[in-house]
Amino acid sequence: MNPLIVLRDSFYFFRINLWAILRLCLPLVVCEALARELVARVNGPDASVMYDVAVGLLFYPLYTAALILFLDARTDGYEPQGRHLLGKALHLWPRFALMAAISTLLIMFGMWLFVLPGLYLMIKLSFAEYLLVLRNVTPLQAMRESFDLTKGKFWPILFTLLAIMIPLWLLDGLSAMAWADTQPTPVRLLVDSVNSFLQLLPTVVLFRLFMLMGKPD
């Protein structure tokens, strides 16, 4: 597996389906950014990071599950309707949110110990979302199967994921410095929404990896 080919194919898919992905995910991404802004206003700049995590757990499972279902349908040649995908995503939300909460806590704990354990868990759990959504398994089963599917594939997944995540992290950091809290709220909402939408790119890349590595023969 060549990471450059995976990235090329993923960018191509994202580009040709950009309008459909925008219509499907952007409204929820904007709602998430607005919710983060409201939480920050209520709790102040020194609010616990858990408030931010809670907002993410409310919205992230919805637009990510919808995107995964969209990716699967388009790969099979179908043109899925957005409301149908969102309906399925809403049905999956309780299980997805539970799994996302467990994964987030594990990765945060790993990062707290040292960076490498958190990074290891992030890679080993990278297919869990796709397993839960596409194979309709329980959160713990999805996490366990993700560990199994990534055996012997840690480094290819790591290199591919870092190749897309590092530029996005840099962009997020630079935009945070350029558009500080002194900027008007609409500007911050716009920047946060754009950054959050671009974070969907790793979902597309990991889906491509899952198609290559994780789907049954």
Could you tell me what each predicted segment is?
Residues 1-217:
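Hydrophobic alpha-helical membrane segments
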